[in-house]
From Swiss-Prot:
Biological role: Defense against chitin-containing fungal pathogens.
Protein name: Acidic endochitinase
Gene3D superfamilies to which the protein is assigned, alphabetical: 1.10.530.10, Endochitinase, domain 2, Endochitinase-like
Keywords, in A-Z order: Carbohydrate metabolism, Chitin degradation, Chitin-binding, Disulfide bond, Glycosidase, Hydrolase, Plant defense, Polysaccharide degradation, Pyrrolidone carboxylic acid
Family of the protein in this entry: Belongs to the glycosyl hydrolase 19 family. Chitinase class I subfamily.
Cystine residue pairs: C3-C12, C5-C18, C11-C25, C29-C34, C66-C115, C128-C136, C218-C250
Family matches, as Pfam families: Glyco_hydro_19 (PF00182)
SUPFAM superfamilies listed in its UniProt record: Lysozyme-like (SSF53955), Plant lectins/antimicrobial peptides (SSF57016)
GO process terms (BP): cell wall macromolecule catabolic process; chitin catabolic process; defense response; polysaccharide catabolic process
Amino acid sequence: QNCQCDTTIYCCSQHGYCGNSYDYCGPGCQAGPCWDPCEGDGTLTVSDIVTQEFWDGIASQAAANCPGKSFYTRSNFLEAVSAYPGFGTKCTDEDRKREIAAYFAHVTHETGHLCYIEERDGHANNYCQESQQYPCNPNKEYFGRGPMQLSWNYNYIDAGKELHFDGLNDPDIVGRDPIISFKTSLWFWIRKGVQYVILDPNQGFGATIRIINGGQECDGHNTAQMMARVGYYQEYCAQLGVSPGNNLPC
C-alpha cells in the first residue's frame, strides 16, 4: 500500500492509508504531518553520537572470527542511516542519545555484540505465516537476519517493498548485503513504532522490548533475556552521558 493522498494535509500510516488521527500520524507514520512524541530541537547528528570509539566498544567484545566483523561496520551503518533521516535526529540531544542507546542495546542483544548475521539455529524455526497478502516461497526461509534479526515472511515482504528488494524470493539478501541489512533494522525501528515509544516520555525502554520480543520476554516469560537488554541500554546511556529514564523492564 502506498498513500495516494495530499501529504501536506494527511498522514500516510505505516500500512499506507491516509488520515489524521493517531492511528495514521502516530507510530510508523511514513509521510505528512506525523506526530512527534516529544518537543525540543537538538543539534547532534547520528555520527556525532555513534563515534568509532562507541562502535568499537561494542564490536570488540565479540570474537575475532565473528562473521559480522566486516559486515557490521560503522561506515555501513551510517550509509544505511542516510536513508532514514528521522532516525536519531528527533527531539532533544538527550532524547537522541537515548534512542541510539536503545537501538544498540537491542542490536547488541540480537547479534551478540555485532557478531551474528543470521539467527543461530534459525533453520529449526518456521517463520512462515502465510496469507493471500503475504505468501511464502517454500524454498526460502524467513528466520532472523541482520542487526535487528528481521524475521517472518510478512516482515521480509514489507521491508522489501520499502527498501527495493525481493523479500519473498530473496530473504537471504538481508544476510548478504550489509547496507540492506542495516536498513531493515531501521525500517523495523521506525515502521513498527519502536522509535515512537522510546521518545515518548510516558513510555520507555520496556515498551521497546514489548514491540521487538514481548511475547517471548515480557510479563515474566524470560526475565533473564529481558534484563540483559535493559543492562545494555543502561550501559550505553552511561557511555553517552544520559539518564535512561523510567519504565525500563516489561
